[in-house]
Amino acid sequence: MIFYIISLKIKLIRDYYKYNACIYNNNMEQIIQNVNTIINLYEQFGGSDYIGESQTQLEHMTRAAMLAEEFGEQNDIILAAFLHDIGHLIEINNDTIKMGSLGIMNHELIARDYLIEKGFDKDIANIIGNHVKAKRYLVTKYPEYKINLSEASRQTLLYQKNTMSQEEMTEFESDPLFNKSLKLRFYDDQSKLLSKSIKPLDYYRNLMIEYLSESTNNV
C-alpha cells in the first residue's frame, strides 16, 4: 500500500512537470511566432522614409532604443523605444488614415493595441500609447519645447490635437506611467539628431523573446 501511494505521488509529480513543460513550450512557440511577425514588419517596411526626417523608420526606432540603453534604462523602456512607431509600419498601406505625407494618424494607439495582442504587457503598450500625449503635454507646459521639435514633429502636432487643456494635463500627470512616458518622448526626440550605425534586428528579436518569456513566467 505504501509503495502504491509513493508510486502514485511520483506519477503525479511527473505528470505535473510534463504538463508545465508542455505549456512552457507552447508559450515559447507563440512568443517566437509573435516576435518574428514584428521583426518581419521592420524588415519589410523599416526602410521606408520616416515622415520627412533624415532617417528611415528602422533607423529612428533603433536609435531611440540604443539611446535608452546607453542611459541605463530597463528593458521595458528600451523595447518601448524600439517599438514606439510600429503603428506607422502596421498601417503603412492604409491611405485612409494617413496624415498627408506625415505617417499614420493615431499610430501610437494602433501600436498599443497591436502589442497587447502580441503578448506585451499593458504597461509597455501604454507607455508607447502615451508618446504622442507626452509631446502635447511638453508643448503645453514648456512652450520652448516646441521650438526644438523637428519640423515633421511640429507638423504632425497639428493632426494630434496640438496643446492640452489644463484638465488633460492634470489627468496625464496622475498617470502611473507619466514619468516613463516622458522618458520615451525624450529618446524619441533625441534619436532624430543621431546618425550612428544601428544594432542588428536580431539583437531586438532576442531582447523581445527574453522580455516576453520572463513576463509569461511571472504571470
Curated annotation (Swiss-Prot):
Molecular function in Gene Ontology: hydrolase activity
Ranges for domain HD: 57-158
PROSITE patterns per record: HD (PS51831)
Keywords: Hydrolase
InterPro entries named among the record's database cross-references: HD/PDEase_dom, HD_domain, OP_Dioxygenase
Classification lineage: Viruses, Varidnaviria, Bamfordvirae, Nucleocytoviricota, Megaviricetes
Protein name: Uncharacterized protein L432
Pfam family, one: HD
Entry-linked CDD domains: HDc
Taxonomic source organism: Acanthamoeba polyphaga mimivirus
